[in-house]
Amino acid sequence: MQGFKQVMTADDLLGGKAFPGKKIVIVGGGTVGCETADYLAPLVNDLSPANRDVIVIEMTKTLAANEGGAGRAVLITRMLSKGVHVLTEAKVTEITEDAISYEKDGEIHTIADADTLVLAMGYRPNTKLADDLAAAGVTTHVLGDANKCGNIRDAIGDGYKVACEL
């Protein structure tokens, strides 16, 4: 991945720390990957039609699997209606300076004209700050993605439970 033209995380892109090119491949079709594709899609259709292309590669059968209900359906429908290309049950097999290869249905396919690779997978909780504070004797409550990767609904619920116990 280090040799690919332009690699960034979804967090950096959404936070304005990195800027994508014209053909964007997003690896990871979870909530973050789909939200990133949805965010980029208006740039494709509203500002400069046919000037950019967004592809999402997801290993599993289901996009945004951790989301539920109407929110998930709205996100996926909106993303697809904006022209985002989705490859489910596809696994990235190789990333070189010039290409991204993936396996789907037992065949290897290559995207050779992409200029931006966005990583939107593999999030892990980070409890370092809470651990350091606890070691210093400070009472802590670890919530949201710092505790376990999830969604805003779960984080709010966890926060409510802790607040009720204080």
Report the location of each language-model feature.
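Short, conserved active-site loop motifs that form the nucleotide-linked donor/cofactor pocket
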Residues: 5-7, 83-85, 90
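Residues that recognize and position ribonucleotide moieties
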Residues: 85, 93, 110-111
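A conserved short coil-to-beta-strand element within the FAD-binding core of flavoproteins
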Residues: 88-99
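Helical element adjacent to the flavin cofactor pocket in flavoenzyme catalytic cores
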Residues: 75-84
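Rossmann-like dinucleotide/flavin-binding elements
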Residues: 1-67, 101-166
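Charged helix-capping and loop-helix junction motifs
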Residues: 70-74
